[in-house]
């Protein structure tokens, strides 16, 4: 393996089901089966959720110790899945935990030995899996830090197939950070593998390679699928380009050079009404056949295209809400990129500040790097905080401050958050 340069941090979270949560009344409960939710857009559609938090804070249903990693929890079929690493120098063991959603009871744990470099045992380096697992039917797909990919049985944790991408291809050490996605019969993984296999499509039933594409270096950004220009498009933001691929065969529709440092290409692309927002770059992708037209910024300097190197913004109608450097939350005009307002009231963190924004029920949940969950109204008129509660203690040390970076999962009127020490479930159910 090639040794990857030290990365500042890693970023690395469909369908609905009828379920019963802590009671006998059946409710429509949305699973959160992959990175950033059912549609991979960060939106939580459940109702019956708290509008304000109790004075004493959120009710913690359960918590369980885990190891290091930046992958998000996922929740599906009454279960919660979290990947981590158990570090016992000089050895490392990557694991997948399955918990019962209601109680936190451990249902199964799958573990395998993985080779970690000497540098990975320094706490500030942030070792462990970053790619968030994805649930698809009765299968759970997990990608490890070095690309070791497993397909596990959701109920038992039994291995259905495995593929060690880090051994079969040329992959930079500890670099497989983007979260996988499922597209029809394919499991698509972005690992930066070479030669020509930066993006790989695998048969999700067998793990067999179906196609490979690009020679781009991997980034921290997870790919998405959009419908635009009359086509399904796979959008991939690497450390050297922004590309649109045909998810069926890997053919490139369009590609724009977009060189960044290893710290910058973090945000997941966001798509809404033919607009594609990639951190601080806005494109129109309505053309048929597929093509991209720049809307803003006018200056094609990499630094001008980065809104935040820690967080993914939210595109809501004609406005964008997202983190900006040094702990700011900003509102931008979607058509022009013009900043309308900013506030520093969410987090005391500056360098490395992070905000995960989740629209829900006409308001928003914001999860900060300090482990706080905030309920707020966001509009072009400004930021109005409704409630704030501490959810989980930050544990990852950087520059004499501790952070928690993994975005939480929201399911069954509950929130699930993880640090490098534990996973926590708290109730957001109204009327409890």
Where are these regions (language model features)?
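N-terminal secretory signal peptides that target proteins for export/translocation
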Residues: 1-10
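Bacterial N-terminal signal peptides
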Residues: 10-25
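Noncatalytic, solvent-exposed loop/strand surfaces
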Residues: 27-432
